[in-house]
Amino acid sequence: MAKKSSSRLPKRKGEYTYRGKTVSELQELSLEEFAELLPSRERRSIKRGFTDGQKKVLHEFKEGKKVRTHHRDLIILPEMIGQTIEIHNGKGFVSVDLQPEMIGHRFGEFAPTRSRVSHGSAGVGATRSSKFVPLK
């Protein structure tokens, strides 16, 4: 019996590429050229232009300041890679290190707004059968 070759491809150990371009090549592109590489929804969002609040966040990135933002809809651009940002999740700020794999995604995807609830056991009197349980 012959061995079957694995259909899974080996993981590549190399530099990350986005649509065939390395991070350094992406950082050299203008915003319009980078927008052409994005999926249609993100491309359309960038072509419409940034809001005043988003422009302020981008300006803080360029200055190298520590950035805290409520703008969860801002798209991660190549010039942001390697920096840390704090994104509001509705209750507090979540610290996120921006990696090359995050290019083209939005800030809100990395700061979940809902957490899993783990309820404790029911108290005395919570159900009809527990009314007559003697208290210790």
Curated annotation (Swiss-Prot):
Gene3D superfamilies: 30s Ribosomal Protein S19, Chain A (3.30.860.10). Signal peptide: none annotated. Residues 114-136 are annotated as: Disordered. Keywords: Ribonucleoprotein, Ribosomal protein, RNA-binding, rRNA-binding. GO terms for biological process: ribosomal small subunit assembly; translation. One of its GO terms (molecular function) is structural constituent of ribosome. Pfam families: Ribosomal_S19. InterPro entries: Ribosomal_uS19 (IPR002222), Ribosomal_uS19_CS (IPR020934), Ribosomal_uS19_euk/arc (IPR005713), Ribosomal_uS19_SF (IPR023575). The keyword Ribonucleoprotein applies. GO terms for cellular component: cytosolic small ribosomal subunit. Belongs to the universal ribosomal protein uS19 family. HAMAP family: Ribosomal_uS19. Protein S19 forms a complex with S13 that binds strongly to the 16S ribosomal RNA. This is Small ribosomal subunit protein uS19. It comes from Methanosarcina barkeri (strain Fusaro / DSM 804). The lineage of its organism: Archaea, Methanobacteriati, Methanobacteriota, Stenosarchaea group, Methanomicrobia.
